[in-house]
């Protein structure tokens, strides 16, 4: 598992989310934003344009619902232990699979926060989700819950930001050697990347 932060860092993030959920009287949070999933678990995928959600309930249960093509990515980049697959085929409705998870977590009649502002939650999927949860639970838009928590950086995050800034400075120094009239952007980008590989 290629996690970029310590177990303690991820534990602290989860605790902060749970505290925020408790303050807002949210029994569970459905994360659809890739950046939220990454921040909480390390899960990194290009599959964020498809329906996938990370469910976190007040008890700390964490379940990812995703497509089969993203299974290995979830296993190899995150600390998520419970990964469920929905079958991506004509006529399938992943919100049916999600509802099974919500039933397992005893969330019927509870209050669920949803990250509606997300690339993977298209208008059509949001409509399906709302229809699926109608008369099942109460829902609220909680698109900013994790975003607000991410604003305050931890010591580990500040260390990464400083390292990233130093790397950006090194790459910029390299750019000036090649940036001139008529220069190929591909060549400039290649030299920038090459300079970072040799560090």
Please annotate each region the language model reported:
Residues 65-89:
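Compact, glycine/acidic-enriched structural inserts
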Residues 32-34, 66-68, 114-119:
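Structural motif
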Residues 197-199:
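Conserved small/polar residues in nucleotide/adenosyl-binding loops
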Residues 180-188:
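Short, charged, surface-exposed loops that flank catalytic or proteolytic processing sites
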Residues 165-175, 185:
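Active-site pocket-lining segments that scaffold enzyme catalytic pockets across diverse folds
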Residues 92-147:
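Non-catalytic accessory segments adjacent to catalytic cores
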Residues 1-61, 173:
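Terminal domain-start leader segments
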């Amino acid at each position: 598992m290629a996690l970029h932060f310590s177990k303690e860092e991820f534990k602290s993030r989860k605790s902060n989310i749970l505290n925020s959920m408790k303050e807002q009287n949210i029994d569970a949070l459905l994360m659809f934003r890739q950046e939220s999933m990454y921040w909480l678990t390390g899960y990194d995928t290009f599959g964020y344009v498809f329906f996938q959600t990370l469910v976190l309930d007040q008890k700390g249960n964490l379940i990812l619902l995703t497509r089969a093509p993203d299974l290995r990515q979830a296993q190899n980049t995150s600390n998520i232990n419970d990964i469920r697959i929905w079958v991506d085929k004509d006529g399938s409705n992943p919100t049916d699979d999600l509802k099974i998870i919500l039933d397992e977590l005893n969330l019927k009649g509870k209050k669920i926060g949803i990250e509606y502002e997300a690339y993977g939650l298209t208008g059509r999927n949001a409509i399906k989700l709302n229809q699926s949860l109608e008369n099942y639970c109460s829902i609220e838009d909680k698109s900013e819950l994790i975003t607000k928590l991410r604003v305050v950086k931890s010591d580990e995050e500040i260390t990464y930001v400083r390292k990233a800034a130093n790397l950006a400075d090194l790459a910029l120094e390299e750019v000036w050697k090649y940036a001139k009239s008529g220069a190929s952007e591909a060549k400039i980008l290649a030299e920038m990347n090459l300079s970072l590989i040799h560090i």
